[in-house]
């Protein structure tokens, strides 16, 4: 099993992946709140376990009308922005990932459970990127998710 530092280094060292992450982030971040809500809705559609883990948010089907869900969605997107901003520095990426992981460890989210976000992220990327969507972009994001998984 790879360590956080090893996986962070693999992402930081891969210029092609970093380009794909930054390009797709440019699209995703145009509407931070909307994209975050879409990502969470896609997660809840694909995972009943996720709905259970997020019970504290209340009625997630209310979408934008649920202030707790909105808050989580916005916070999630700014965490992703921190990851993107740290793509050129292994130590910085490791630090922001480990801080992000603490929140999930405290809520008893396992690495495998966290990895379930890749499918909903793929759906979100496809919806947001349209004809610019490709599987290489999903793979780049999956590599970033793997860094978080290693920290859990």
UniProtKB/Swiss-Prot annotation:
Pfam families: Globin. CDD domains: Mb-like (cd01040). PROSITE patterns: GLOBIN. The modification N-acetylserine is found at residue 2. Residues 12-152 form the Globin domain. The keyword S-adenosyl-L-methionine does not apply. GO terms for molecular function: heme binding; metal ion binding; oxygen binding; oxygen carrier activity. The keyword Acetylation applies. Keywords: Acetylation, Heme, Iron, Metal-binding, Oxygen transport, Transport. Belongs to the globin family. PANTHER family: BLR2807 PROTEIN, GEO09476P1. Heterotetramer of two alpha chains and two beta chains. This is Globin-1 subunit beta. It comes from Anadara trapezia (Sydney cockle).
